[in-house]
Design a protein with these regions (language model features):
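A structural signal for short hydrophobic beta-strand segments in well-ordered beta-sheet cores
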Residues: 29, 142-145, 200
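Short alpha-helical oligomerization interface
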Residues: 23-28
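A short, conserved acidic/glycine-rich loop-to-beta-strand motif
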Residues: 122-132
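Conserved N-terminal catalytic core of the sugar/cofactor nucleotidyltransferase
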Residues: 1-9, 17, 31, 35-114
């Protein structure tokens, strides 16, 4: 098990692009490999990280019960707030240590030891993005950097890598460097201005994102 003690799975979104499936269930509970997207995510994380926290919003009561049954340590209701609200407004804001952050629609295989080693090598920045090579059919935020210091993030200009939805961040340090951000994009740009946003040289061993029912069906044909 890595020395990273905390992970956050962001799972509060409505999953509009997966309607009508998400009319009755929240997106994180979409069926995957005999279980659900978020149950598999929690199970994988639990092999490496002892404390797993989940943000919920849409159909929050249903999802909260599900993730607690799956072993989540705590649940934060962020309904009506931005995706980075929890960084500034929950007990996690005081953590002065690396926290692994993922989104519920990422299916990923990570080498946590390598990732943590890379974070230490970069002098434990306020935030380190974990990138992937662009995948055809999946939109993303392209990352531009100079010696791993991020200089720009763009959805228009293309680069060799884009955000995977995975990052390692230090909540207390972010609160010291930034004012409360409207979303992660705003948070990142505040960090860029301070020279405090880094990008990892370690990529996920396997990675896929689920934005549509078609992508979910495709992933279920060859799960990992």
């Amino acid at each position: 098990m890595s020395s990273i003690q905390h992970a956050v799975i962001m799972a509060a979104g409505r999953g509009m692009r997966m309607m009508p499936l998400t009319t009755s269930i929240p997106k994180p509970m979409a069926p995957y490999n005999g279980s659900t997207l978020i149950a598999r995510g929690i199970a994988r994380l639990a092999e490496h990280v002892p404390h797993i926290h989940v943000t919920v919003g849409y159909k929050g009561a249903m999802l909260a019960q599900h993730v607690v049954e799956c072993g989540a340590s705590s649940v934060f209701n962020t309904d009506g707030h931005s995706n980075c609200w929890w960084v500034y407004n929950t007990l996690l804001r005081s953590l002065d240590e690396p926290v692994c952050v993922l989104t519920c629609d990422n299916v990923v295989d990570l080498d946590f030891d390598l990732l943590e080693e890379n974070y230490r090598q970069l002098d434990e920045p306020a935030c380190m993005l974990v990138p992937v090579r662009p995948v055809e059919g999946l939109d993303g935020d392209y990352v531009f950097h100079r010696d791993h210091v991020v200089t720009e993030i763009s959805r228009v200009k293309e680069a060799e890598i884009y955000c995977s939805g995975i990052q390692i961040l230090n909540p207390r340090r972010i609160n010291e460097v930034t004012k409360e951000a409207e979303n992660f994009y705003d948070l990142w740009y505040q960090l860029i201005a301070a020279g405090a946003l880094m990008v990892s040289s370690v990529y996920p061993k396997k990675w896929s994102a689920v934005d549509t029912v078609e992508q979910l069906l495709s992933l279920n044909k060859s799960p990992f």
